[in-house]
A protein has these predicted regions:
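N-terminal assembly/interaction segments in proteins that build large macromolecular machines
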Residues: 2-286
């Protein structure tokens, strides 16, 4: 039997939100296999399904730098050990400089030069720091980018929209609407734009978890298979509506979906408006 360390239990608890003893028991039952233990907790209903990014365990900030013509944007996550350092003016200046450097040099990932800048400041401040991730989002001539930083920089979003009449992106009302989409994504962190973008193998696994939970539900004992399949289908449909951007209730009016809000905005301008991509960064998330 594999030895279960307190660090393993802590890591599983941070990932799933389940209790310490439940996590330890799951690791023991799975002989130390982290993925199996996580799945076991889900099947027992002790861990939330993956609707949101992992719980943040690091301090730091998300930085975004965008070109003046909104044709490209860079997102950066810079981490530190403490919130005190994450609020340090030198730390903030470094994050902004990294984002600007990456945008200027057309980078899409950290490199030795940027990591060296981080280590220089870490040595000066005497606290461990790290450039966790960096990416660039680009827009075509018929697309438009906007950004949103939440709070003190713990969440950052860049959203990309497309239109058959790209001149509408000069319209202030449309710009405001696209910004509200970025705000929505920051608030609800959808896993995908729509159902077609969901990985089917991953969805099959979630369906399997629902099946196990239903088998353990005393209220469903003795139900006909046809009835159970209907319940399962309903659970999957509800789950998809919670994790797919276009099916979520729009942040400014939850009576309508994001898809409907896009349609209504398009009608006002006489153009078709679609979301073609987005990037969501949360400090400490995997």
């Amino acid at each position: 039997m594999a030895e279960i360390s307190p660090a393993d239990v802590k890591k599983l608890r941070e990932k799933t939100g389940a209790g310490m003893m439940e996590c330890k028991n799951a690791l023991v039952s799975s002989d130390g296999d982290f993925d199996k233990a996580e799945k076991l907790l889900k099947e027992k209903g002790l861990a939330a399904l993956e609707k949101r990014a992992g719980r943040a365990t690091n301090n730091g900030k998300v930085f975004i730098k965008m070109k003046g013509d909104n044709s490209a944007a860079v997102l950066v996550e810079l981490n530190a050990e403490t919130d005190f350092v994450a609020r340090n003016p030198e730390f903030i200046a470094l994050g902004e400089a990294i984002a600007a450097n990456a945008l200027e040099k057309d980078l899409n990932a950290p490199n030795d030069e940027l990591n060296g800048l981080v280590q220089d400041l870490a040595t000066k401040i005497r606290e461990n720091m790290g450039l966790k991730r960096l990416c660039q989002v680009k827009a075509s001539s018929n697309e438009y980018l906007t950004q949103y930083i939440h709070g003190d920089g713990n969440i950052g979003v860049v959203v990309k929209c497309e239109s058959d009449k790209p001149e509408i992106f000069k319209n202030e009302e449309v710009k405001s609407f696209v910004f509200s989409l970025a705000l929505h994504i920051a608030a609800f962190n959808p896993i995908a734009i729509d159902r077609d973008k969901i990985d089917q193998a991953w969805l099959k696994e979630q369906e399997g978890i629902f099946r196990v939970q239903m088998e353990q539900d005393e209220k469903l004992k003795g139900k006909q298979e046809k009835v159970l399949e209907g319940i399962l289908k309903g659970k999957v449909t509800k789950y998809l509506s919670e994790i797919c951007l276009l099916e979520q209730g729009y942040v400014k009016d939850e009576k309508i979906t994001v898809a409907k809000a896009l349609e209504e905005c398009g009608k006002k301008t006489g153009a078709k408006l679609t979301v073609t991509g987005y990037v969501y960064y949360r400090v400490g998330a995997e």
